[in-house]
Amino acid sequence: MTMTPLQLGDKIKRFFQPSLPPVGVEIARDFVAAVRLNPKDPTRVERSAITPLPSGLVNPSLSQPNISSPEDLTTVVKSILAKTEIKTGRISLAVPDSSVKVAIHQLDKLPGNENEKQQLLRWRLKKTTPFNVEDAHLSYVSQPGPDGKLNVLTVIIFREVLEQYERLFQGLGIQAGFITSASVAALELLPRTEAGSIPKSTLIVRSSPFSLTAMIIHLGTIVFFRHLDYFEEAQVDGAVPRVLESSGGEIRNLYEEIHPCLMYYQDKLGTAGVDRIWILAPQDLQPEELELLSRQSGAAVSNLNPLQSFRSYPPGSLPVLKSLLAPSLGLAMGSF
């Protein structure tokens, strides 16, 4: 049976732990964010906060240690947990997209035995992963794909990287019961955003000054995932990040980055193009910018508002910082 985006939300929850408290924490390259929802009403945000990080404290990498000073980062995390009055012993955690490898595999079928499934998926990841896949934690979700095949979404993280984040919270007496990439966490908000009008295909673009992640959902199945990290490139040559240039180049460069995604989708599935594009950026695009992207892509383009899923939230900076808080909001929402 083909899944709708609403069913996709239920499927993605296999990545989440429903028994976890409605608390989401994200550790990014340049900030730590935390969100706590009302445990009885997932549409109420009770507390949220973002704390900037000094440069170099968190260095996202697939194969190298991510945290340069666990003691300093622990101090920041402890402070933000106090601000948001998070007192639970278990949380959900989002880590940088650049610290986790997400891939999609088209398979005729998966073995019935869990050990055989793990072996098959690790074997497929072996040639494209810059670390020993046997020294990594692998999660996956199987989705119906085109032509009766399976689309298997895998999320793999090097164990040394994973344990750095786990130890950070263990030192505070907290278990990170579920850990995933920031963009996968934010994806939890999509089914609720599209609840009123479900398109056949959707492109979600999550951008920051130094990175871009693009995901395409076709008939409820994740068929495309692409992450680009420009931080190291900018560090080497001093270049302005390509995704968000100044002097009016922002939208042109954003389209240049998502154009290959659209072409891949059309070529792979033989379709005319995506129906809708959601943009999740630190600042909402202006109406004229959305219109330009719509003309370039041939799709309806809108800012994705993470707060659309919530009926109430504390006054203050949350509406301004909503896009930065999207992964934490998605994690907390995914606990229900």
Which residues does each predicted region cover?
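Hydrophobic/aromatic-enriched cytosolic interaction surfaces used to assemble or bind macromolecules
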Residues: 1-336
